């Protein structure tokens, strides 16, 4: 994945050395360049950060489509057709209906390179600008709406629904390739992450009640 990104304008780390079998380092090891910056603090300058996150995602999604032959295809983390409502839910019937909808045939939509875990904590910012995008472990070829949905879910539980709506609006303002199936993939993303989630494992600022 990082070799592919090195040929693109995406600000990702570059590979310095790799020992995937652990022959030298005893464990699988990857050494990369260090990117400048730190994860952004959204509440301070929310609009500016969200715009940069939206612009960067457009760059990711525009990576040469030859990538489809070099990376795995998108797949959900869990089998939504056999998933059950979260044990902590107070409205299991609502979750059952959501799972029914998410298990339907995915709607057609643009496919491209996706980060698969795109959210503020996997980006870096330096001197007021986005300086890097990290953690490409789950990178794959799939619906553009998956990355948007993943960002929106993280923004919703960390900062509220207004932040999630703002990101979608900004993304749509900087690209002509707009997924028409966003609500479906928002639902799939949420269920894929939350059905087996223990709320106690979330960072303190994450509040599922915001959903």
For the regions a language model picked out, list residue spans one by one:
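ATP-binding pocket architecture of kinase catalytic cores
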Residues: 1-72
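Conserved Rossmann-like nucleotide-binding pocket used by diverse enzymes
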Residues: 11, 114, 119
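An alpha-helical support segment within catalytic cores of ATP-dependent transferases
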Residues: 20-23, 46, 58-116, 127, ...
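A glycine-centered beta->alpha junction motif in the catalytic cores
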Residues: 21, 29-43, 80, 190-208
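Short, glycine/acidic-enriched loop or turn micro-motifs at the edges of active sites
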Residues: 36, 118-120, 138, 150
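Active-site Asp-x-Gly
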Residues: 111-113, 126-172
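Helix-rich C-terminal or lid/interface subdomains of diverse kinases
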Residues: 150-211
């Amino acid at each position: 994945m990082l070799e592919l990104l090195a040929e693109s304008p995406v600000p990702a780390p570059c590979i310095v050395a790799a020992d995937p079998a652990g022959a030298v380092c005893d464990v699988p090891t990857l050494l990369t360049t260090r990117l400048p910056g730190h994860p952004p603090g959204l509440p301070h300058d929310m609009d500016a950060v969200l715009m940069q996150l939206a612009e960067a995602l457009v760059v990711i999604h525009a990576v040469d489509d030859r990538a489809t032959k070099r990376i795995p295809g998108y797949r959900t983390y869990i089998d939504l057709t056999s998933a059950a409502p979260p044990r902590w839910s107070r409205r299991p019937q609502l979750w059952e209906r959501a799972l029914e909808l998410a298990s339907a045939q995915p709607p057609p939509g643009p496919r491209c390179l996706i980060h698969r875990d795109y959210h503020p904590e996997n980006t870096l910012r330096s001197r007021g600008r986005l300086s890097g995008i990290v953690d490409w472990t789950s990178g794959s070829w799939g619906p553009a709406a998956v990355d948007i949905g993943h960002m929106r879910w993280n923004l919703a539980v960390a900062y509220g629904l207004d932040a999630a709506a703002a990101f979608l609006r900004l993304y749509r303002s900087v690209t002509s390739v707009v997924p028409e199936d966003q609500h479906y993939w928002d639902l799939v993303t949420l269920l894929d992450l939350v059905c087996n989630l223990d709320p106690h494992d979330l960072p303190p600022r994450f509040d599922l009640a915001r959903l």
